[in-house]
Amino acid sequence: MLNYISVICLAKLERRRNSDDEIDVEIDLGAGMPKYPLELNDNILWVGTMNEDETTKSLSDKVLDRGNLLSFPRPKEFISRAKANSVEAASMLPKNVWQSWLDANVIEEEQFISRIDKYKKGLEAVNEAMEFAGRALGHRVWQSIENYMANHPKVIAAIQAESFDAGVCDLAMQEAFEEALVHKVMPKLRGIETDGETKTQCIDKIESVLFGPNGKDGLAPGLQADFEHAKKNAYETFIWSSAKYLEIEE
């Protein structure tokens, strides 16, 4: 149900972007009252949170493509809580802080432009390999990955540093690319068979792009342990269900 609501809201927001017509969403007020039409002006954003874990069904590609996702590794040590204390509400975000985040985007910076092309070509190679399994990536996936990398705090810090360090910048962009792959590409590989021709023509080719032909010089080496884990399960299909790459960053 939550997935359905998410898709409906996203569809209306997309219509708002491409149309001058009045777009509204009907709010159920209860008590037998008529539904209240809320016009989706430019000053209205749809914000909500939900967990995707073993208690929920998988979210659709549409929701994953347009959502902002957070991944967490499994806890290595459990923390006790004797008493559940109430959490104070966070203060409102000042507009100037929000604007500073928008202004920090480095997508037009030369150091970013000169490094992003190899990731674009790599993702195109992944897309080509996915064709054998009847899967594909669209323009939106690449655009979201590119913008994710351009807005990543580590990438921004590396490019805007007073003393630019190419090695630090390269590592920051690699980590940002890895995070974006987990959120935008790995869900699209779910269910692909990990044996037979599908393995050799799809999974193995993707693996070669991400980790290199001999396990070296790939675009996303930090994801190798998770990728191996996704291939090895009783169903013999690709299922991404771990976050070991976050433990590496720690």
Regions found by a protein language model. Name each.
Residues 1-250:
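C-terminal regulatory/interaction module of P-loop NTP-utilizing enzymes
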